[in-house]
Amino acid sequence: RRCFNHPSSQPQTNKSCPPGENSCYNKQWRDHRGTIIERGCGCPQVKSGIKLRCCQSDDCNN
C-alpha cells in the first residue's frame, strides 16, 4: 500500500507502508492555526472532535 503522508498545506508526498498495512488515513482537526490535516498509513484511534477517514487503495487519503 502507498499512502500520502504530507501535513496540511505542504506539497504532496507519499510513502510505502510496511508489509501487511493495507489502510491509509486522513485525520483533521481545528486549533488556533486553523484546520490541521495529518495523513499516513494505518487507521489510528482518535479522540472525539477529530475527523478520521480511512481507506484501502493507493494514495486514497488526500
From Swiss-Prot:
<dbReference type="GO" id="GO:0030550">
    <property type="term" value="F:acetylcholine receptor inhibitor activity"/>
</dbReference>
<keyword id="KW-0872">Ion channel impairing toxin</keyword>
<feature type="region of interest" description="Disordered">
    <location>
        <begin position="1"/>
        <end position="21"/>
    </location>
</feature>
<dbReference type="GO" id="GO:0090729">
    <property type="term" value="F:toxin activity"/>
</dbReference>
<feature type="disulfide bond">
    <location>
        <begin position="43"/>
        <end position="54"/>
    </location>
</feature>
<keyword id="KW-0528">Neurotoxin</keyword>
<comment type="similarity">
    <text>Belongs to the three-finger toxin family. Short-chain subfamily. Type I alpha-neurotoxin sub-subfamily.</text>
</comment>
<keyword id="KW-0964">Secreted</keyword>
<keyword id="KW-0629">Postsynaptic neurotoxin</keyword>
<feature type="disulfide bond">
    <location>
        <begin position="3"/>
        <end position="24"/>
    </location>
</feature>
<dbReference type="InterPro" id="IPR003571">
    <property type="entry name" value="Snake_3FTx"/>
</dbReference>
<keyword id="KW-1015">Disulfide bond</keyword>
<dbReference type="GO" id="GO:0005576">
    <property type="term" value="C:extracellular region"/>
</dbReference>
<feature type="disulfide bond">
    <location>
        <begin position="55"/>
        <end position="60"/>
    </location>
</feature>
<dbReference type="GO" id="GO:0099106">
    <property type="term" value="F:ion channel regulator activity"/>
</dbReference>
<keyword id="KW-0008">Acetylcholine receptor inhibiting toxin</keyword>
<dbReference type="InterPro" id="IPR018354">
    <property type="entry name" value="Snake_toxin_con_site"/>
</dbReference>
<keyword id="KW-0800">Toxin</keyword>
<feature type="compositionally biased region" description="Polar residues">
    <location>
        <begin position="1"/>
        <end position="16"/>
    </location>
</feature>
<dbReference type="Pfam" id="PF21947">
    <property type="entry name" value="Toxin_cobra-type"/>
</dbReference>
<dbReference type="InterPro" id="IPR054131">
    <property type="entry name" value="Toxin_cobra-type"/>
</dbReference>
<comment type="function">
    <text>Binds to muscle nicotinic acetylcholine receptor (nAChR) and inhibit acetylcholine from binding to the receptor, thereby impairing neuromuscular transmission.</text>
</comment>
<feature type="disulfide bond">
    <location>
        <begin position="17"/>
        <end position="41"/>
    </location>
</feature>
<protein>
    <recommendedName>
        <fullName>Short neurotoxin B</fullName>
    </recommendedName>
</protein>
<dbReference type="InterPro" id="IPR045860">
    <property type="entry name" value="Snake_toxin-like_sf"/>
</dbReference>
